Amino acid sequence: MTVLITGASAGFGEAMCRTFVRAGFRVVGAARRMDKLQGLRDELGGSFYPLELDLTDRPSVAAALASLPPPFGEIDCLINNGGLALGLDAADRADFADWETMIETNVLGLAYLTRLVLPQ
């Protein structure tokens, strides 16, 4: 069984990667920071596949999923953990660009990735 976990380079995502690999699953760990993912690969071995992924770049998300090698290409479980928190100032001072980036990542990116993985 293969699990795709976004936000895998730190925090809950990183911890879930360790937990699932140690439980015997294959894990695709996706994040923007490949250097952190490579460190996890070194730690977790061949059951972990690092995938550089920017959820706001739809064409690259589709290409990244299409490039997954066997046996990692067939995703059985998606954990949409990736996200960020920007534009947290009071509404009258918050930067709209931060809000747009956060919505593109946390809402649209999640929806797009889910749609791509669902046909499997």
Task: Set out the residue ranges of the language-model regions.
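Conserved glycine-rich Rossmann-like NAD(P)H-binding loop of the short-chain dehydrogenase/reductase
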Residues: 23-39
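The beta1-alpha1 cofactor-binding region of Rossmann-like NAD(H)/NADP(H)-dependent oxidoreductases
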Residues: 53-63, 96
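Conserved NAD(P)H cofactor-binding loop of Rossmann-fold oxidoreductase domains
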Residues: 82-87
